[in-house]
């Protein structure tokens, strides 16, 4: 059997060992140290914000943002429905209530139309949310300027979940820098990785300092161990920060490679009937973290996942909308249009293809060959049925 092709595996640069060795030589192996400080500073400079706090995951970063915005039990938080569950889980950590917002077709991300309707209704009912979490899916920025403008009009802060979009640019600004807070993920499948890790960023330096405090068990600066509020064990280790520094050095290369992979897929498959790739919104440049497409040719995403799996190739359906997940039942949901849910339609028809930046042309050729054969077989069956 062929070597397995994964959806988005880690891609080491070769420089990671240098920084790991530095951490061991200096004995800075705890969740603090000079490499943590350097990683925070370099990431903040890279995206153009004043401050950043390195933490154990993107989920932890979202949780800290909610803590900083004083989200409490019973408060509502508006959240994009079309996303991974980690976006909304921290809302439940604080016993708040998620209200889900549909996507729109241009970006597949939060619909400003649905958001505006939700905000208008919440204002009438006196239940404005404590925060809005917008997500940049598969590397593509949401219409962040419109979303932030709407939320500003209602006095609601925005958390930008840029877990999948580090390196993406929208209207000349780096992804993750539009809201009150932005978050990034460095999970093993992301465009750069620290094995597990995340970053909370903001232009509010005092808030980021408070985030570091909360992420360090909220330990107060006393000789003895003193704590006056709930804290968390969320800090990133100095060793993993070293991995992050090495990865950040090759971010531009990783973006270029993922965009090349997308282009190769589109050139090979984009002409086929019923195959439509995730559009790139005109105002942005996506990092194309994952190549995604929708099908309208008689095949389901599960047909493709199964066929590729038979060839030892990993693929997955798009995210299942959170408002349809049992965890959040019953869930309040605002759709983009009266005729139905955009994100539910995308989920039913969409698929993610292998997109790792260390995938070779030959490996991608294998994926394309299997898909072309599968699509051709479907067309032949349709043609045969039509002449009977």
Swiss-Prot record:
The intrachain disulfides are none
Residues bearing the modification N6-(pyridoxal phosphate)lysine: 190
Query: Per UniProt, which keywords does this protein have?
Result: Aminotransferase, Exopolysaccharide synthesis, Pyridoxal phosphate, Transferase
Q: What class of enzyme is it?
A: transferase
Name the Gene Ontology biological process terms: polysaccharide biosynthetic process
Q: What induces it?
A: Repressed by SinR.
E.C. code: 2.6.1.-
Q: Which GO terms describe its molecular function?
A: pyridoxal phosphate binding; transaminase activity
- InterPro entries, per the entry: DegT/StrS_aminotransferase, PyrdxlP-dep_Trfase, PyrdxlP-dep_Trfase_major, PyrdxlP-dep_Trfase_small
Cofactor entry = pyridoxal 5'-phosphate
Belongs to which family?
Answer: Belongs to the DegT/DnrJ/EryC1 family.
What function does the entry list?
May be involved in the production of the exopolysaccharide (EPS) component of the extracellular matrix during biofilm formation. EPS is responsible for the adhesion of chains of cells into bundles.
**In its UniProt entry, what is this protein called?**
Putative pyridoxal phosphate-dependent aminotransferase EpsN
Species annotation: Bacillus subtilis (strain 168)
Species classification: Bacteria, Bacillati, Bacillota, Bacilli, Bacillales
**Source gene?**
epsN
């Amino acid at each position: 059997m062929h070597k397995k092709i994964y959806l988005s595996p880690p891609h080491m640069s070769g420089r990671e060992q240098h920084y790991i060795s530095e951490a061991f030589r200096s004995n800075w192996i705890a969740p603090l140290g000079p490499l943590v400080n350097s990683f925070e500073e370099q990431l903040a400079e890279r995206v153009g914000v004043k401050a950043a706090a390195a933490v154990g995951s993107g989920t932890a970063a979202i949780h800290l943002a909610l803590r900083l915005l004083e989200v409490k039990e019973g408060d509502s938080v508006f959240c994009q429905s079309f996303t991974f569950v980690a976006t909304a889980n921290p809302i439940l950590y604080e016993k708040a209530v998620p209200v889900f917002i549909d996507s729109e077709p241009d970006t597949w991300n939060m619909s400003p139309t649905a958001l505006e309707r939700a905000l208008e209704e919440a204002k009438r009912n006196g239940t404005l949310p404590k925060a809005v979490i917008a997500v940049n899916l598969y590397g593509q920025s949401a219409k962040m300027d419109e979303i932030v403008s709407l939320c500003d009009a209602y006095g609601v802060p925005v958390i930008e979940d840029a877990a999948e979009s580090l390196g993406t640019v929208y209207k000349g600004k780096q992804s993750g820098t539009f809201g009150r807070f932005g978050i990034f993920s460095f999970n093993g499948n992301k465009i750069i990785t620290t094995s597990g890790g995340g970053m909370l960023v903001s232009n509010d330096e005092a808030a980021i300092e408070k985030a570091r405090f909360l992420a360090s068990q909220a330990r107060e600066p006393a000789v003895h161990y003193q704590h006056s509020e709930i804290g968390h064990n969320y800090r990133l280790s100095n060793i993993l920060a070293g991995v992050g520094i090495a990865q950040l050095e090759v971010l531009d290369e990783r973006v270029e490679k993922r965009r090349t992979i997308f282009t190769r897929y589109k050139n090979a498959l984009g002409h086929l009937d019923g195959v439509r790739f995730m559009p790139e919104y005109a105002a942005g440049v996506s990092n194309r973290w994952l190549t995604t497409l929708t099908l309208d040719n008689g095949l389901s995403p599960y047909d493709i996942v199964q066929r590729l799996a038979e060839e030892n190739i990993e693929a997955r359906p798009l995210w299942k909308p959170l408002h349809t997940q049992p965890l959040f039942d019953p869930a309040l949901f605002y759709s983009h249009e009266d005729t139905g849910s955009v994100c539910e339609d995308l989920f039913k028809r969409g698929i993610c293809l292998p997109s790792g930046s260390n995938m070779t042309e030959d490996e991608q050729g294998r994926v394309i060959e299997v898909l072309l054969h599968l699509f051709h077989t479907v067309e032949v069956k349709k043609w045969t049925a039509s002449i009977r």
